[in-house]
């Protein structure tokens, strides 16, 4: 899962003025999809699935009380699942788009709100998402989402900057508390794995990749050791499961054989050994099925 927080500069995500440029850019694949008869994904927010670009621009541009001319007015969060993660989100475009909206609403934006340490929930954030299916320059199908987030909360009273580093202190200059991006990325990854059942390899985790990029030599070595240990434990667990799966058919076959033998035994005729004396036979009779002394054995079948 690749999640980025963008905004600033003079390019597509320039954010000190109107968000018109961003909303226009985020509609770039709509016309092509309509030409091909494919469904277009509209903007959405926490409670609505269909929002026009005009409304998005109006709401973001007018939610900037007490922001100066050069202050950021909004940010853009990009959520890009890998191909394997997409498979866990659904089999069709429609299923995956619905899963992405749920993930953005229930997890990404909730973790975003919590990241400021101000007791906020996703309902307090002014945001609008847009789902895309193809990245520029990519030939293959590749779904991802862009989320325009206002610098101010929905009440237009609190400044929220995800670019302000978290220090653990209550007051950090003009912005209280800052934003813990590392914790945000980690929580988004964990909640995705939990809600989709995705079995993430240790080398694919945010902590591992972040350490490989930014960690010290000692931290990198320790993280590699951790990944090797986790992979070894997973392999041993898989071996145990394979061994159990191989044994179960033989155990089942043995139980069936025992059951069959039990059924056969229950059908064996019972021999009634109670002798009956035949007074009209001679003592030394040698007729078949008869014993000397006038005793004859009868077999009774149940």
Model-assigned labels for residue ranges:
Residues 1-302:
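N-terminal nicking endonuclease/strand-transfer module with a His-rich metal-binding environment
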């Amino acid at each position: 899962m690749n999640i980025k927080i963008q905004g600033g500069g003079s390019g597509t995500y320039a954010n000190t003025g109107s968000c018109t440029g961003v909303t226009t850019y985020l509609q770039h694949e709509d016309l092509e999809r309509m030409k091909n008869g494919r469904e277009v994904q509209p903007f959405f927010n926490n409670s609505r699935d269909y929002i026009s670009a005009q409304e998005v621009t109006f709401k973001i541009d007018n939610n900037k009380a007490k922001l100066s001319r050069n202050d950021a007015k909004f940010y853009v969060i990009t959520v890009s699942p890998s191909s394997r993660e997409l498979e866990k989100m659904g089999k069709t475009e429609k299923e995956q788009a619905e899963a992405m909206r749920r993930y953005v609403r229930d997890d990404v934006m909730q973790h975003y709100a919590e990241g400021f340490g101000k007791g906020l929930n996703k309902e307090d954030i002014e945001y609008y998402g847009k789902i895309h299916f193809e990245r520029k320059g990519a030939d293959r199908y590749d779904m991802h989402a862009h989320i325009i987030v206002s610098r101010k909360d929905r009440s237009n009273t609190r400044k929220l900057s995800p670019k302000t580093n978290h220090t653990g202190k209550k007051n950090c200059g003009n912005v209280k508390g800052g934003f813990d991006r590392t914790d945000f990325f980690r929580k988004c990854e964990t909640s995705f794995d939990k809600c989709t059942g995705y079995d993430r390899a240790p080398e694919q985790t945010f902590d591992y990749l972040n350490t490989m990029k930014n960690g010290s030599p000692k931290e990198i070595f320790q993280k590699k050791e951790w990944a090797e240990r986790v992979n070894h434990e997973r392999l041993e667990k898989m071996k145990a499961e394979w061994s159990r799966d191989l044994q179960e058919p033989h155990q089942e076959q043995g139980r069936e054989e025992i059951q069959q033998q039990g059924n056969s035994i229950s059908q064996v005729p019972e021999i009634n050994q109670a002798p009956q004396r035949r007074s009209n036979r001679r003592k030394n009779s040698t007729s078949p099925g008869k014993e000397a002394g006038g005793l004859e054995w009868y077999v009774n079948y149940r």
